[in-house]
């Protein structure tokens, strides 16, 4: 019997229109919280979703264009407990 795949659980899904300045402020707030606390919290009404990445993340960037619609995506994934691997140096 093949191993079962883990079930995908959607913890947050939200879309809204923002100005480019509002979006930039959101990205800056996420970056500030990650640097200071190692996590950030999305608040939607009374619900809160804490996003706490591991030390090591995989980052993907994608920019696409279809007709006059442009899409730029930033995605980062991690495994719980993943630590940054030591970097090799030469002396």
Language-model segments: what does each one mean?
Residues 1-32:
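Terminal, regulation- and interaction-focused segments at domain boundaries
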Residues 2-10, 48-60, 64-91:
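Long protein-protein interaction modules used by eukaryotic assembly/scaffold proteins
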Residues 21, 38-40, 70, 74:
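Short non-domain terminal segments
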């Amino acid at each position: 019997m093949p191993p079962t795949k883990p079930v995908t659980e959607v913890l947050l899904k939200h879309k809204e229109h923002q100005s480019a300045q509002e979006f930039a402020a959101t990205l800056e707030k996420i970056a500030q919280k990650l640097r200071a606390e190692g996590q950030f919290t999305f608040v939607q009404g009374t619900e809160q979703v804490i996003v706490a990445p591991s030390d090591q993340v995989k980052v993907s960037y994608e920019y696409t264009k279809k007709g006059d619609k442009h899409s730029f995506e930033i995605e980062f994934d991690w495994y719980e407990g993943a630590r940054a691997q030591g970097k090799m140096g030469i002396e």
